[in-house]
Structures are given as C-alpha cells and as structure tokens.
Regions:
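Conserved Class I SAM-dependent methyltransferase catalytic core
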Residues: 77-140
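Mobile active-site "lid"/loop adjacent to the S-adenosyl-L-methionine
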Residues: 51-82
C-alpha cells in the first residue's frame, strides 16, 4: 500500500500511525501533490480531498476548523477542484477494473457522479453517512 499527502505534517502523523499499527513493512509513505510523484498502479485509490469552498470558511462549524486549511478548502466556488483532477488522473493509476473511492461534501454528489460518468467510470455508487447525507463516492474504471 502507498499513503501520500502534500503536507509534511500529515505524512509524519501517518508514519507514526503506520508504525504504531505494525504496518511499516506494508505501507510506503510518499510526499506527492495528487499523483505528481506516483509511478505505480493500484487496485484501489482512496482519497479525502479538500472540498469546502474558501468562500464558506466563515460559516462552517467550529469543529471543522481544527483541521489544517490545506486539508479543508478549495479555491473554486463549488469545491470540486480536486475531484476534477483526481477523477481525470486516477484512470492512469488504476489497474483494470480498479476502484476510486472518496469522501465528498454536502450537495456535491450530483456533480461528482456526472464527472465520474463523463470520464468513463462505471458501477458508480453514492453512500450516505449517518445523517443521511451523500458522503462517499465509489466508482470503477
């Protein structure tokens, strides 16, 4: 398995968690901005990209602001900036019949499903969270 992030701080925390779980020999940690430093293919790609538009920063729940801004906010108006990139690029890093899975924000599922369909993904499934909000997208290439 490979774990990647653009944040050095996030990677250090991931490395500690991997070590504490006894998975150091099974998980490679890599600093990468999306797929920038990736040179292999996977059966599954899981992502929790930033999806809150920066314009909504003042109105979000206080609990959310404990995470670093880099992990939360996008510069575009709909919060879809990273999904567009991931959906387009992941096809090059997924094995045949591989899966892409990611968390999404409120009211983003329709656009994300359309992006997946437009980019040739199949078996698209949207999963709701405990509050019955569309929260996870799963798709197969």
């Amino acid at each position: 398995a490979t774990a990647l992030d653009v944040s050095e701080k996030a990677l250090k925390i991931a490395e500690e968690n991997i070590k504490n779980l006894g998975l150091s020999k099974k998980v490679k940690v890599l600093k990468s901005d999306l797929f920038e430093n990736v040179d292999e293919k996977f059966d599954l790609i899981v992502s929790n990209p930033p999806y809150i538009p920066l314009s909504e920063k003042a109105t979000i729940q206080k609990e959310v602001t404990f995470d670093p801004e880099l992990a939360l906010f996008t510069k575009d108006a709909k919060g879809l900036e990273f999904y567009e990139k991931i959906i387009k690029e992941a096809k090059n890093y997924l094995n045949k019949n591989g899966y892409l899975l990611f968390e999404m924000g409120i009211d983003q599922s329709k656009e994300i499903k359309e992006l997946l369909e437009t980019n040739g993904y199949k078996n698209i499934e949207i999963i709701k969270d405990l509050a019955e909000i569309d929260r996870v997208a799963i798709a197969q290439i």
